Regions:
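Core AdoMet radical
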Residues: 57-77, 81-104, 117-134, 150-177, ...
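Short amphipathic alpha-helices and their capping/turn segments at secondary-structure boundaries
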Residues: 77-83, 134-148, 179, 208-219, ...
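Short, electropositive alpha-helical surface patch
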Residues: 108-116, 143, 203-221, 250-251, ...
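Hydrophobic faces of well-ordered beta-strands that scaffold small-molecule active sites
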Residues: 29-33, 90-92, 125-127, 151-155, ...
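Conserved C-terminal portion of the radical SAM core fold
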Residues: 175-235, 251-274
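Acidic (Asp/Glu)-rich catalytic clusters
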Residues: 81-85, 111-120, 140-150, 182-186, ...
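N-terminal [4Fe-4S]-dependent radical SAM core
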Residues: 1-52, 56-91
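Auxiliary Fe-S-binding modules of radical SAM enzymes
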Residues: 2-20, 24-29, 229-323
């Protein structure tokens, strides 16, 4: 197992440092590709309306019809990344909506198009999806790319509690998440898990238990940790406007994240420590900081507190839970 300082001089495994280490110091940048997918929780397959925290406007068919081709998006994204960040290598990131929600042959066509734009400089494929849109055939497709690219599958766990998943209209149970994780167990596809902290009915101790769940699965290589934020155009946003509820302050969230990562397995790489909505959509919480300022604030607090990722992780507990 790696140590927290394997990837950067931080108190946790930092994704940017991980990429630099893996790709010999080269600057690696994710290029987002929007393939115009929808979501089974919106089109009636699993439900309507989507998750209550989602902005409904981001799922309109009109937006999808106006999209440039995958090739055009990636070429433009690479050009911007090189110009603005001097990026040298790229990961093609199918991010918006549910990017395995289609027949496998159609997915192959899209992924192939994305990975063929500039094969000399593309090093990875990242695909965001829901746990209920994964099966053996789709995992086999993703694994077929691992001889040429690093491949990770990003899935929204959001919460480990079915009560929460029901309240937020997730349309997906925690058991479905566990089933998808287990499907990937013996593949070469890395798993990235997305979580949301701060649902008002979940207690501090309930949220800490997310770490125990994540730690059980060695195929989980990456995590994205988000705090709950309320955005315009969401069902939760309308409810919050009528009856505001408690959300994390930045100090409360930093204190919680510090404790959480101390229980997190020390080899896991943290791709993100917090979420950040566009300011024109954000209702709350508004911490009054830019993304880089929030990142710096959290890093400094973690360092000052002497928090180390995995310092409270107990492998023997995982052995008990997995039996």
């Amino acid at each position: 197992m790696g140590t927290p300082l394997d990837y950067g001089h931080k108190n946790y495994n930092h994704y940017g440092a991980y990429l630099k280490n893996k790709y010999d110091g080269q600057r690696v940048y994710k290029i987002i590709a929007d393939a115009g997918f929808t979501c089974p929780n919106r089109d009636g397959s699993k439900g309507y309306g989507g998750c209550t925290y989602c902005n409904v406007d981001s799922f309109t068919p009109e937006l999808s019809r106006k999209l440039p081709t995958i090739r055009e998006q990636i070429e433009q994204g690479m050009e911007r990344a090189y110009k603005n960040y001097r990026a040298e290598k790229f990961i093609i990131y199918f991010q918006p909506n549910t990017n395995t929600y289609a027949p496998t042959h159609y997915l192959k066509m899209l992924y192939d198009e994305g990975l063929s734009v500039n094969t000399d400089n593309i090093v990875g494929l990242s695909v965001g999806t829901r746990p209920d849109c994964i099966d053996f055939e789709k995992l086999a497709l993703l694994e077929s790319y691992t001889d040429r690219f690093d491949v990770d599958l990003e899935m929204g766990m959001e919460s480990i509690y079915d009560e929460t998943l029901l309240k937020i209209n997730r349309g997906c149970s925690h058991q479905e998440f566990l089933n998808a994780i287990r499907l990937a167990e013996n593949t070469k596809v890395d798993i990235c898990v997305h979580t949301i902290f701060g649902f008002p009915w979940e207690t501090h101790d309930m949220m800490l238990k997310y770490a125990d769940e994540i730690n059980q699965f060695p195929q989980i290589k990456f995590v994205k940790l988000h705090h709950l934020h309320i955005v315009k155009g969401s069902i939760m946003g309308a409810k919050y406007s009528r009856d505001p509820f408690k959300l994390f302050t930045i100090d409360e969230y930093t204190d919680f994240i510090a404790e959480f990562i101390s229980y997190l397995r020390p080899d896991i790489v943290l791709q993100r420590l917090f979420g950040l909505a566009d300011y024109d959509l954000l209702i709350a919480p508004n911490w009054g900081m830019k993304k880089s300022q929030i990142q710096s604030y959290i890093d400094k607090r973690l360092e000052a507190a002497g928090i180390i990722q995995g310092s409270n992780y107990k492998p023997e507990l995982m052995d008990t839970l997995s039996k």
